[in-house]
Amino acid sequence: MTTPAGSGTGYGSVSWWGLSPALDLQAESPPVDPDSQSKTERKVPELDALLLGSVDGRHMLRTLARAALWPLRSFNFYVLENNLEAVARHMLIFSLALEEPEKMGLQERSETFLELWGNALLRPSVAAFLRAQASHLANLVLEPDRLEEQLPWLSLRLLKFRERDALEAVFRFWSGGEKGPEVFPMSRLWDSRLRHYLGSRYDARRGVADWDLRMKLHDRGAQVIHIQEFRRWRDTGVAFELRDLSAYHVPNRTLASGRLLSHRGERVAARGYWGDIATGPFMAFGIEADDQSLLRTRNGQPVKTASEITQHNVTELFREVAAWRGPRAIQGNVEETESPEPDVPAQEPFTIHFLPLDSSQTLHHKTCYQGRFQLLYVSCGMVHLLSPELGACVAPGGNLVVELARYLVDLRPKELKAFSDRVVEIARVAGFAPHTATKPSETFARFYKLGDSTPGGGDSAVESGPAPSKVESTRAPLPESISPPQANQAPSLEAMSPPLADLAPPLETMCPPQANQAPPLEALSPSKADQIPPLEAMSPPQAKLVLPVEAISLPQADLASPPEVISPLQEAMATSWVNAPPKHVT
């Protein structure tokens, strides 16, 4: 229910972009063990990383871009999201980032990426590219052989069949299977979310944006975000204005997701925008840079905006990835690379494996995952999934990186501290210990695995796979002590860490609060019953079952009850809302 002070839920219930800078995962993982490497001299060492809620692939892109500064290594990224729309965006982003230069130039690729990734509205040319690419991906999803041939870096074999069907439906919706802007009226949906979030402060929304930027984001390290670009994004959803603002008028369908609502006593599926409307997509690539000249200030003001820094960083990222993939493509082992067969395509030096949406608590049952991963990354919205069972999948001495809620404007310092303490407690229970010698970071917390705490034995018949990797030392070296061997390397982006709660849309966004109770936050950990496939996959028999968000008057008193599982981030945000003093913005 909207209160005079607003709902206090600008974070959203599903994440589309990272709320912290990108990380080089090699710098965060333990170094290659020389003993184990000598035993397999002819094999290229591998990095197995498990990422929960990475959302936009920024950490993987950053890792690939920096790979040329490290010894030769191949990568196996295992990605777990809580909604299939996020999986589809991963596929779209990487297919764009790895597009052949002959088909699309570097500048065009970077501009297209920024609009698809962070803008609510698109230019017609970018919308046409989205339709064509989505149609192509929809045809590949259901044909594993063609998918492996055309996108050898992608593996969907671990997804369930119904998830692949739903994924294909997402791409069909993106490709324009349902015509007309009324199918997804983004501008109206954005304004509806904004009104619900601000309440009576809606008419003073420019003042609210100024306060959130100057008194919160700037104080927390994001000084390069300019007030004009932040206001524009808060008002229209357009974060990156690469052309005249009037050129952006086509809804970005990649930001659409479905959720179950209760309408007149019946549970119905509604498509809408349930993402972030408070912080913005500036944190992932826009507040840090290898080129320190981009962060200079003049008369106390940054000379570059977050949008300009983001465009520069993304362009350099794509350039470095393209340069690394060419000469360093791996052909299985060193000997084979010298004389590959002419008809056999070169093996990609990395593979992205997408895991089933509900597999976080069952991975340890499969022996191929027990003690396999040298690195586990968890976003702030997925912290509740960190458990001893998940910790059993990390090799002894492996590292854990947890994103903190530093850039969530709805949380006050007191709630941020409580959330950080809760993260430490959850990590200890899962079998990890903090890196006490590391420099404290407000962006994310770092831990290492204590010994081998595999809970029970796994069933080797469940799934076969390569033997899990082991890290020799009980305590992994600190991330700050790990750096590429080159002397001329650019400074690493320590602050660039992954946030974003990419969790399936909950039902509480519009739930009215009780008299003495804060309104439930948009669930970061929705119950299984509320996790629905994309609307196209549901094929409802009656048109009345699929309603736009405006068809359901906001807020509704008969919305479905909130899920029982409450994540630590949700608790912190609820506390923030309860203790919030009345806000008066003039």
From Swiss-Prot:
Cellular compartment(s): Cytoplasm; Dynein axonemal particle
Please list the GO biological process terms of this entry: axonemal dynein complex assembly; brain development; cell morphogenesis; cerebrospinal fluid circulation; determination of adult lifespan; determination of left/right symmetry; heart development; lung development
User: Keywords assigned by UniProt?
Assistant: Cilium biogenesis/degradation, Cytoplasm
In this chain, the stretch annotated as Disordered covers 455-493
Predominant subcellular localization, coarse grouping: cytoplasm
The positions making up the signal sequence are none
| GO annotation, cellular component aspect | dynein axonemal particle; extracellular region
The protein's matches in PANTHER family, at most eight in alphabetical order, are given as: DYNEIN ASSEMBLY FACTOR 3, AXONEMAL (PTHR22118), DYNEIN AXONEMAL ASSEMBLY FACTOR 3 (PTHR22118:SF14)
What this protein is reported to do is described as: Required for the assembly of axonemal inner and outer dynein arms. Involved in preassembly of dyneins into complexes before their transport into cilia.
Identify its protein family.
Belongs to the DNAAF3 family.
Identification of the protein by name: Dynein axonemal assembly factor 3
